[in-house]
Amino acid sequence: MQKSVRYNEGHALYLAFLARKEGTKRGFLSKKTAEASRWHEKWFALYQNVLFYFEGEQSCRPAGMYLLEGCSCERTPAPPRAGAGQGGVRDALDKQYYFTVLFGHEGQKPLELRCEEEQDGKEWMEAIHQASYADILIEREVLMQKYIHLVQIVETEKIAANQLRHQLEDQDTEIERLKSEIIALNKTKERMRPYQSNQEDEDPDIKKIKKVQSFMRGWLCRRKWKTIVQDYICSPHAESMRKRNQIVFTMVEAESEYVHQLYILVNGFLRPLRMAASSKKPPISHDDVSSIFLNSETIMFLHEIFHQGLKARIANWPTLILADLFDILLPMLNIYQEFVRNHQYSLQVLANCKQNRDFDKLLKQYEANPACEGRMLETFLTYPMFQIPRYIITLHELLAHTPHEHVERKSLEFAKSKLEELSRVMHDEVSDTENIRKNLAIERMIVEGCDILLDTSQTFIRQGSLIQVPSVERGKLSKVRLGSLSLKKEGERQCFLFTKHFLICTRSSGGKLHLLKTGGVLSLIDCTLIEEPDASDDDSKGSGQVFGHLDFKIVVEPPDAAAFTVVLLAPSRQEKAAWMSDISQCVDNIRCNGLMTIVFEENSKVTVPHMIKSDARLHKDDTDICFSKTLNSCKVPQIRYASVERLLERLTDLRFLSIDFLNTFLHTYRIFTTAAVVLGKLSDIYKRPFTSIPVRSLELFFATSQNNRGEHLVDGKSPRLCRKFSSPPPLAVSRTSSPVRARKLSLTSPLNSKIGALDLTTSSSPTTTTQSPAASPPPHTGQIPLDLSRGLSSPEQSPGTVEENVDNPRVDLCNKLKRSIQKAVLESAPADRAGVESSPAADTTELSPCRSPSTPRHLRYRQPGGQTADNAHCSVSPASAFAIATAAAGHGSPPGFNNTERTCDKEFIIRRTATNRVLNVLRHWVSKHAQDFELNNELKMNVLNLLEEVLRDPDLLPQERKAAANILRALSQDDQDDIHLKLEDIIQMTDCMKAECFESLSAMELAEQITLLDHVIFRSIPYEEFLGQGWMKLDKNERTPYIMKTSQHFNDMSNLVASQIMNYADVSSRANAIEKWVAVADICRCLHNYNGVLEITSALNRSAIYRLKKTWAKVSKQTKALMDKLQKTVSSEGRFKNLRETLKNCNPPAVPYLGMYLTDLAFIEEGTPNFTEEGLVNFSKMRMISHIIREIRQFQQTSYRIDHQPKVAQYLLDKDLIIDEDTLYELSLKIEPRLPA
């Protein structure tokens, strides 16, 4: 039998004695017994963290005691009472206060207590809550930290006091010396002073003259002193000091806000999640909590101390000494470094934890706290990443207004240099985790949730509004008109493109997103993209005329469900081209990489993942490149820093092309290079692919077994694989060895019942078939001859040749080759002909399961049905042709292939792949950045010349020819933006119009035309003006004319609103004008024109109008409440957090406030340089800039459908109605003079 636990009973009785006399809380409570479930009244005494209970108040010996360490206390409802005849007793019991003490150990029964008064119960609960030794330790630690800080401050003050004492002593000595000098001078003057007559003998006129002179001297001195003071006030030094003080005040406000954000992070998330991790069924482990919130609490304590120091410095204003505060902050930077290095892992752990529904539900409860103001946890985790760059900007501004001889200058410069070192790391981490935070933000907007966005390898590409066209059976489009309002309203979809999936959502009135029940999440690997449905689908022929060639089709063939079609309508051709480029590139990244993997796995000892891993240039840092831990959409580490040459090399690396790298490069290339250099690199890749591609890439591109013997003796890690192409193949290809040979392949259908694949055999004629020994086709087999003369360059091989070498081990390679070609060209066959020539039993649904998931079906091209079997050729896509050629060159050649022919095969692969890459990059460039070619005619002509040269290539594949022709047509056609209204057109139309008065215009008319003007000006800003912070330079009008025009228009509109209000002489008219303008601002909000809202609210907040108390007294309460709501929406608080959230929850068209994005760009530009000290491009910074430009262009590309009204526009653009700021204030003083002090 186990012995009972022994304890020091004598000491326990002594503690009970102390509890009866000095206990924290004492009194009678009713205790529920565990055996009979009855209540007994006991006298309880709480001493520290031990609860004693006695039989009565006079009892000396306790009846029992409870250890309260690690327990919790909570109120419980009154237990139900049985019995109908005891109503009075039950009511009395229900009025009592019940609470329970819960112990952490499982199986430990809780202590149930009750008391008669609620106040007494609350006091008992509060006392039990505070009876924790662990909490006292935490408080003690906090106090110790504060004590250490105060000791440091006291020591600093002692040193300062000692210095002041020495200064006072020196000054006393100086005063004594000066006094002695004065005495000596006075004695000298007395000796030199001549005899003076008595003052009484002085003439009265002389006395008056002296008084006047004395008065004049005093007046001149005061005038001179006033001039000196005014000169100093207007001097650059005083202006600098004023700006410096303003910077410090702003810094204190920002620090206060930041400390509040950290407080919410710690108290609203960290501590509650720690408690949840200690529960019986924890939704999250303690390790995960520590990983997510590493050093968060310490950072909060650090900044609380820093904030208190700032406030103490402000109390000593106008003397502001800040350098010692930063000296306190600098030693703590290692804490920040740990937080920064953990940031990406933190967000990845958070994304993984969100897959747990219990944790996700709990997190949503925490985020619903009003203190969070709708912000998510990952937002709070990112705030510390922005704080150090904000300090750097503040120090830059302080140093700009701090004289060189200032006592603080060296200290501030040292602090800035230390912070900049950490800031570079922070910007890199923020850039690397931008994608995870974007995915989590979108996932939180979707009401149903979306688990695929919790995959941290998923990369966001683009979003926008598209119209989903309803369809009926067999994919026939409903007869709807493009201008149908019902179609736009009911069919509008918010679409999100990721590297692996395509999301289609509807947006509710509250701004939340809902995934479509059918086809809401499309896996791109199951999708076929048809860019011109009228050209590829007979059922939808003529839809191009109905929809103006703005529609495109996505055919989805999921492996476990029936196929279906999604038809989407873009708002413009340029928008459609951009969507097409991105979707096709994402599908390429998935399928072509998978296709290359299959081909190399079947025909080589080196697979594509190993091929990429074995290339150290793709993942190991070097003198001219540095990588981050994050992988891009092609599973290759993202570039953090790189030279221009390495960036161009990555752009033209034929093994892969990451869509996120391509978009970032095209957005920001003009920061570190020119369009001519980029085009020159593309031209070199096309004309001289072997000399333009690094030798190492070529070696790994063809890293396969060299011969039959090598296949059995050399493994994938042999150095021979790396030495195979130590020098590039010859560039010149003679016509005799040209890969244009009469060679055909027969595609056999239907499916073989055993292997589930189509039999593809080589033959010298369409009627001669060489059967595979592994599987022979059924008797009723239709064959589709495919002309692959441009895809393969091996000489013809007769059936006899294969039969003679049946016993040769190379037959296995040939069989692998045939299987690879089957997978590569399966979708390249004309679908209509395959259906005609195949067996009736083999329909499309039977063919779907055997399609290789890595086959690029989105580039499928169908020949017209009128062609015969003799002259019909398969139009192989570039990716398919590349796979076929790679499969052909990837293994040892059959007997009869000489070295020259093998070289031609490999050269053909490189040329076709290089052509495909050049066309792909040009397609993205032309479709997404048409302004580059509109503003640079020389660049446009060079691209046209290159495309014409590509089209003259006799070996060009049909699909490549079509792609080049499409790019050529896009460049040659007139500017598509001509259909849009421009500001110059509006001004020209309003020149001869008669001016309208404010009273004759309705609020709706004003709001619509303000929105139209704001959007026209905002849309006209070319993206290159957002680069390089040109709007802050001295030559800003030349470098960023459109941004300055937008800023000027904002100021003119704000001045117009203020001027119109001040034009009224009586109070009621001014109040009515204010109410009308507030109504205009509210309509602008409904139209998603937040720039217009800010134009009007900023005008109403001007001092000239805000001070008119009598006028505002006449304004209705409803208008004032609406004004407050609008101001809160566009407030700059928290980096425009409310405006950002509002923009996130609205569909374009919308007009954001441009200053918000310019602030973000300035923050990035000033935080980190474009180039490192080694001269490498800071590509992490380029990625952050690209994300902001992408968001701006999202709002630029969707236009409003508002009719232009010249009369209203003429009023809004009339400069004669605008009164300058000084005149406005003078007019305001005349209307309502200042009250006497």
UniProtKB/Swiss-Prot annotation:
Positions of region (Responsible of the affinity for farnesylated versus geranylgeranylated Ras): 1099-1128
What PROSITE patterns does the record tag this protein with? DH_2 (PS50010), IQ (PS50096), PH_DOMAIN (PS50003), RASGEF (PS00720), RASGEF_CAT (PS50009), RASGEF_NTER (PS50212)
Spell out the residue ranges making up region: Regulates proteasomal degradation: 744-752
The record's section on SMART domains has: PH, RasGEF, RasGEFN, RhoGEF
Q: Where in the cell is it found?
A: Cytoplasm; Cell membrane; Endoplasmic reticulum membrane
Q: Which UniProt keywords apply?
A: Calcium, Calmodulin-binding, Cell membrane, Coiled coil, Cytoplasm, Endoplasmic reticulum, Guanine-nucleotide releasing factor, Membrane, Phosphoprotein, Repeat, Ubl conjugation
Ranges of Low complexity composition bias in the record: 761-774
The residue ranges flagged as biased composition, category Polar residues, are 791-800, 841-855
Domain PH residue range list: 22-133, 470-588
Q: Does the keyword field hold Cell division?
A: no
Q: List where the protein spans the membrane.
A: none
Q: Which GO terms describe its biological process?
A: long-term synaptic potentiation; postsynaptic modulation of chemical synaptic transmission; Ras protein signal transduction; regulation of small GTPase mediated signal transduction; response to endoplasmic reticulum stress
Provide the assembly information.
Homooligomer and heterooligomer with RASGRF1. Interacts with Ras and RAC1. Interacts in a calcium-dependent manner with calmodulin. Interacts with CDK5R1 and EPB49. Interacts with the AMPA receptor through GRIA1. Interacts with microtubules.
> What is the UniProt domain comment for this protein?
The Ras-GEF domain and the N-terminal Ras-GEF domain form a Ras-binding site and mediate Ras activation. The IQ domain mediates the calcium-dependent interaction with calmodulin but is dispensable for the Ras-GEF activity.
Under what name is this protein listed? Ras-specific guanine nucleotide-releasing factor 2
Record the organism.
Homo sapiens (Human)
State which gene encodes it. RASGRF2
